[in-house]
Curated annotation (Swiss-Prot):
The gene is rpsN. Binds 16S rRNA, required for the assembly of 30S particles and may also be responsible for determining the conformation of the 16S rRNA at the A site. GO terms for biological process: translation. This is Small ribosomal subunit protein uS14. The keyword RNA-binding applies. It comes from Chromohalobacter salexigens (strain ATCC BAA-138 / DSM 3043 / CIP 106854 / NCIMB 13768 / 1H11). Part of the 30S ribosomal subunit. Contacts proteins S3 and S10.
Length: 101
């Protein structure tokens, strides 16, 4: 089980990403616009740098919904490998069965 502080930190990051998503997209559109002047693009780049560091989506880490474990995460199920295995053995995941050859 991950520390509660780490799980809360990830939730805080997710809120920041949602809060600043529109602003970031607007500034990035200006930066990548070839028709905009160099000064406008530079100003947009400076404003983008002024946004909180944690508002960038790449700062987020996928975590297991049950345990908060950051490694061994299966995005399709939203679970870590251990909890996914337990759920599969109980038959909680439809269509998933243990492989054997």
């Amino acid at each position: 089980m991950a520390k509660k502080s780490m799980i809360e930190r990830e939730l805080k990051r997710a809120k920041l990403v949602d809060k600043y998503a529109a602003k970031r997209a607007e500034l990035k559109a200006i930066i990548y616009d070839v028709n905009a002047s160099d000064e406008e693009r530079f100003d947009a780049q400076l404003k983008l740098q002024q946004l909180p560091r944690d508002s960038s989506p790449v700062r987020q880490r996928n975590r297991c919904r049950v345990t908060g474990r950051p490694h061994g995460f299966y995005n399709k199920f939203g679970l870590g490998r251990n909890k996914l295995r337990e759920a599969a053995m109980r038959g909680d995941v439809p269509g998933l069965k243990k492989s054997s050859w």
